[in-house]
């Protein structure tokens, strides 16, 4: 299987499977001299790890990251400094239950990659989906922790803005609320609504989709390039690579189809300090594939988890019709834990474009 690497200068390769002994990543192209502690990476993995509420999978993984290479340890025994060589990181799997998947070893679960993997490779890891499992994204989040260190002054934050048909009230948006509830919601008022709604979904053994929004602030103007190296193009590509993501929009996104040119185009004026300012941000901080200096805004839609208790019609590897009922521990709404994953992907895209811009123009933005 190829295509396990993304990025041009900031390059990330992930490896490992859901029920293997471990998974991890190699970050190549990280500049030397970046100083950080293990906790600077672990904080993001803790945000993604399973078992933190009744609304996510009850698989228990500590997701403790180990840095194996690419750094030198300071005298304090905690602070690491990147050397410019590949940074390899490892996360052990400790709570696999492969026996839960024995009955589907030859059955194709509806909505999963079982059929397409078998069709393409002639073999698949049925234990939790193997490489196609969202478990792989733990390695991406670790890489995103490194990416956040690359571009000075950039803050990447994500939030859940919709579960099923229940959307947040954007007038209530408060970033301080995101870490105060199990949904990463910026709207405190929607939390009890989501709790009641997801409890019903969970008890029924079903699942539901969601929408995640990621905002990157402090992104320097000038990142990205036309025509085939657009910043929004690469952000969309990386977000689409996340398991269960079926749609991505930048800025106004699909709402632009309902908007007039007068309302959609972001007007400009000169600020009091003599620098240009935008009067709106419908473009999501990117014009012509190049960052404007405004916040970069991306949203992505996550489909309902395909692993549900409801019996579904399918076929098996022998070409027989079967009824499939998925066992194991699964997220009733995978969109919740997709928030830190989306953050990591956007951070990696921005870090890559920052290094590419620096290499092409020589500017330290």
Curated annotation (Swiss-Prot):
Catalytic reactions of this protein: 5-O-(1-carboxyvinyl)-3-phosphoshikimate = chorismate + phosphate
E.C. code: 4.2.3.5
Any one of the GO BP annotations: chorismate biosynthetic process
Annotated positions binding FMN: 131-133, 243-244, 288, 303-307, 329
Cofactor(s) recorded in Swiss-Prot or TrEMBL: FMNH2
Cofactor info, note text: Reduced FMN (FMNH(2)).
Family: Belongs to the chorismate synthase family.
PANTHER family linked to this entry: CHORISMATE SYNTHASE
Name of the protein: Chorismate synthase
Species for this entry: Rhizobium etli (strain CIAT 652)
Gene: aroC
């Amino acid at each position: 299987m190829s295509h396990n690497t993304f990025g041009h200068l900031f390059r990330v390769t992930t490896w490992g499977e859901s029920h293997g002994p471990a998974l991890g990543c190699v970050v190549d192209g990280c500049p030397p001299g970046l100083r950080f502690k293990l906790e600077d990476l672990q904080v993001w993995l803790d945000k993604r790890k399973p078992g933190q509420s009744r609304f996510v999978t009850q698989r228990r993984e500590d997701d403790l990251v180990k840095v194996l290479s690419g750094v030198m340890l300071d005298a304090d025994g905690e602070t690491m400094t990147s050397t410019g060589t590949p940074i390899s990181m490892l996360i052990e799997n400790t709570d696999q239950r492969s026996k839960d998947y024995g009955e589907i070893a030859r059955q194709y679960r509806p909505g999963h990659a079982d059929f397409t993997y078998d069709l393409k490779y002639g073999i698949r890891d049925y234990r939790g989906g193997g490489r196609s499992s969202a478990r792989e994204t733990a390695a991406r989040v670790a890489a995103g922790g490194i990416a956040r260190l690359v571009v000075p002054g950039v803050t990447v934050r994500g939030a859940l803005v919709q579960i099923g048909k229940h959307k947040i009230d954007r007038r209530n948006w408060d970033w301080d609320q995101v870490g105060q509830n199990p949904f990463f919601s910026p709207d405190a008022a929607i939390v009890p609504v989501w709790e009641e709604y997801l409890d019903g979904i969970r008890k029924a053994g079903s699942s539901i989709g969601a929408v995640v929004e990621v905002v990157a602030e402090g992104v320097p103007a000038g990142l990205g390039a036309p025509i085939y190296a657009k910043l929004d193009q690469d952000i969309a590509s990386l977000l689409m690579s996340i398991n269960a993501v079926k749609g991505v929009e930048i800025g106004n996104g699909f709402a632009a189809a309902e908007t007039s040119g007068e309302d959609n185009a972001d007007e400009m004026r000169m600020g009091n300090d003599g620098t240009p300012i935008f009067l709106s941000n419908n473009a999501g901080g990117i014009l012509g594939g190049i960052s404007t200096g405004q916040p970069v805004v991306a949203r992505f839609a996550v489909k309902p988890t395909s692993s549900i208790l409801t019996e579904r019609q399918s076929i098996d590897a022998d070409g027989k019709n079967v009824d499939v009922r998925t066992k194991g521990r699964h997220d009733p709404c995978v969109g919740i834990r997709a928030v830190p994953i989306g953050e990591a992907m956007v951070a990696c895209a921005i870090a890559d474009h920052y290094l590419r811009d620096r290499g092409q123009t020589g500017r330290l933005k």
